[in-house]
């Protein structure tokens, strides 16, 4: 550059089908130069991000996801350390268990309320409980309601049969086909559950889901 200034460079990486940002970072590191080495704690962190966003490699995990994971393992990512890093406390575990225990099955949808008392991040626990409900045979999608800070947070999950994004969009939210959410205000949990049921009924009648 004539003025002697170094121009800024930007790398734009757009992969809508990537499992996570951590996968893309690992992929860039892998090919940015030969024989690159990263610290084990950095590898652990990136690996943990992939594990979280893919729900233990069960959601949106493609061949390149596993290639990124293999690269991180070669660079010191330790699955035992990562597992310990991702463990929750007893209150979180009990809350998830209560959410699953009290779930209602409505037209192949598992609906439940996640208790928020005593939890540091109740909305995260609610999302984790929604994932757990998909492990039940016959459940096409799950929606967990978490009341926190005067707002009802909806965490919707599915595997491949229901586009939960469409349901959440009807409720003012959004997301992706298998992972979506919404927020409801100025109503009780009972009214929120009734609203979701009516939305499911309406969309099924319309053939929208």
PLM region spans:
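Short glycine/serine- and small hydrophobic-enriched flexible loop segments
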Residues: 26-31, 70-74
